[in-house]
Amino acid sequence: MFLEKLNSATSKIKLIEEKLQDINLIKNQKKYSKIIKEYTYLEKINTKKIEYEKILSQINDNKTILEKEDQQEMKELIKQELIDLDKKKEDLEHQIKILLLPQDENDSKNIIIEIRAGTGGEEAALFANNLYSMYIKYSERKKWKTEIINFNETELGGFKEIVFEIKGKDVFKKLKYESGVHRVQRIPITESNGRLQTSAATVAVLPNIEETEIDINEKDLRIDVYRSSGAGGQHVNTTDSAVRITHLPTGIVVQCQNERSQHKNKDQAMKILRARLYEFEDSKKQEQRSSNRKQQVGSGDRSERIRTYNFPQNRITDHRANITLYKLEEFMQGELDPLLDPLTIELQEQKFKSNNI
């Protein structure tokens, strides 16, 4: 099955090369760009295939030599080389399997992250702030740019909700598996008896969708303006600069009050709405795809409990891949890769099986 899919993918290269020779194709920039992207992707697979075939050939040659070799010292050298070649073969197979997975067209997109406090009152809001800080520190390590779109702060400095954007290379690809319920176990600063409390916050990672990528009918929108308010309901603006947009067909409501001008708040609210509508349509497609197999692991379902942060034990556990690390302090300082890398590999392995690769 693996080799069949590999050969099937690389066999399309010649057909695409013929398409690219069509002079009329350049006139349609959108179509041309799409074909170039597919060609680059298939070329990447083909390069790995050539490398893989070379390794297979070397393995076969070494096995043949080993059968004929009489000297024990040479036999040991050949055996060691075969071990090294087998390791390279396994690594290449894994790389090729990743490339053969159905491509997520959003992997190269920037993202909008929404963090909302869940069960746990003020402690949940403080944890939402901790998660926001964690993603900001991770973004700084990756040299990504961040911008707050909207937030609703509590009196103790927590967030009932915060929405922010991250821009950079492969942002969605790296963080798309963060969607879900994040649970925290710790003694809250608000707890005088020193009892351990469990709280939660919900994270949604949405690809940033351009205006040209989704059609939104102005007639389907109800736009309300109101005065923006700060923590505890204090008014921070004397003009009606805050904007609330309701998408009537779906009932999706977005709001923004972070900017000083109504126009900018509307632009930011529309940015969130595009991302939410895209997610709404995409989730419907996912349900259809998975209707014949109850498998939604790593799907980005925001109701799925994905991770527990246990502060007294300095422990972080990801429930989707049964990964546990005792490096919670470093993790909260933005060192996410020691968990994200093995998590991504595990979730991809699960996808290999479900896609029969």
Swiss-Prot record:
Indicate the principal place this protein occupies in or around the cell. cytoplasm
InterPro entries documented for this protein: PCRF, Pep_chain_release_fac_I, Pep_chain_release_fac_I_sf, Prokaryotic/Mito_RF, RF-1
Q: Is Protein biosynthesis given among the entry's keywords?
A: yes
Give the UniProt keywords, A-Z: Cytoplasm, Methylation, Protein biosynthesis
Instruction: Give the modified residues of type N5-methylglutamine.
Output: Q234
Which region is the signal sequence?
Answer: none
Protein biosynthesis recorded as keyword: yes
Report the PTM annotation.
Answer: Methylated by PrmC. Methylation increases the termination efficiency of RF1.
One Pfam family this sequence matches: PCRF
List the coiled-coil residues. none
- Which PROSITE patterns does the record match to this protein? RF_PROK_I
Cysteine disulfide links: none
Superkingdom as given in the UniProt entry? Bacteria
State the family named in the UniProt similarity comment for this chain. Belongs to the prokaryotic/mitochondrial release factor family.
Q: What does this protein do?
A: Peptide chain release factor 1 directs the termination of translation in response to the peptide chain termination codons UAG and UAA.
Q: What's the protein here called?
A: Peptide chain release factor 1
Biological source species: Borrelia garinii subsp. bavariensis (strain ATCC BAA-2496 / DSM 23469 / PBi)
Q: What is the lineage of its organism?
A: Bacteria, Pseudomonadati, Spirochaetota, Spirochaetia, Spirochaetales
